[in-house]
């Protein structure tokens, strides 16, 4: 395949044929066939360690979800939720050895589904902070060390494969092809995205101001 690749422009192929050879050669190279035996051994070790770390990361995420529930002691804080929802939270607390309390279990998503319904701002803040802190609380399920290891292993693997960094390795087979092209595209999109975000922010602020005024409470940004 390497011989065909090196002579692809002299084989009388059409554009599709040349592209096919280039594709096969790229797959050949990214599979590590151009590496020395020592490099192949190291790549194998990296892949094995990455698989282990990825599995551990996922297990930690699930454990954090199960151990990051927000506990509420005053039913009044749950204003905005239906009686049925509150009953579910009470049962969850009871099932976890906390009768008389309310347990808001987190879900494995960025946004927690109960946030839009809860009127109490302080409770919304507690839920949000508990959600974003998952995996970085310094406990046995903290994923920061794993992320650091995976980042270093990705960089090492990319270097062995002949790429300047993991981003270049990952993008080589994508439409953008390289980090520079991605950064150029993002820089072109950024002004419009920022302007739109500010516009949406103004709409949300007006909504907050209106709702707080209706409640007779001070607004917030």
What residue ranges belong to the model's regions?
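Short His/Asp/Glu-rich catalytic/ion-coordination signatures at enzyme active sites or charged loops
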Residues: 3-45, 105-145, 149, 153-196, ...
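Active-site-proximal, well-structured secondary-structure segments within enzyme catalytic domains
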Residues: 16, 20-22, 49-52, 59, ...
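Elongated amphipathic alpha-helical scaffolds of membrane-associated proteins involved in membrane
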Residues: 28, 35, 39-43, 50, ...
């Amino acid at each position: 395949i390497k011989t065909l690749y090196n002579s692809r422009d002299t084989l009388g192929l059409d554009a599709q044929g040349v592209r096919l050879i280039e594709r096969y050669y790229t797959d050949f190279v990214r599979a590590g066939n151009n590496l020395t035996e020592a490099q192949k051994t190291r790549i194998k070790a990296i892949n094995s360690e990455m698989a282990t770390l990825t599995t551990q990361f996922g297990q930690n995420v699930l454990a954090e979800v199960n151990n990051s529930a927000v506990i509420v002691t005053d039913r009044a804080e749950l204003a905005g939720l239906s009686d049925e929802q509150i009953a579910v939270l009470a049962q969850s607390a009871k099932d976890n050895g906390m009768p008389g309390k309310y347990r808001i279990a987190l879900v494995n998503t960025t946004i927690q589904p109960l946030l839009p319904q809860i009127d109490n701002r302080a409770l919304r803040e507690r839920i949000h902070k508990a959600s974003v802190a998952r995996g970085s609380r310094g406990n046995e399920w903290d994923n920061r060390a794993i992320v650091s290891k995976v980042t270093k292993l990705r960089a090492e693997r990319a270097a062995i494969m002949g790429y300047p960094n993991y981003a270049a390795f990952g993008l080589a087979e994508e439409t953008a092809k390289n980090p520079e092209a991605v950064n150029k595209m993002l820089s072109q999109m950024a002004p419009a995205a920022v302007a739109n975000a500010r516009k949406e922010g103004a709409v949300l602020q007006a909504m907050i101001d209106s709702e707080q005024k209706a409640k007779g409470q001070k607004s917030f940004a």
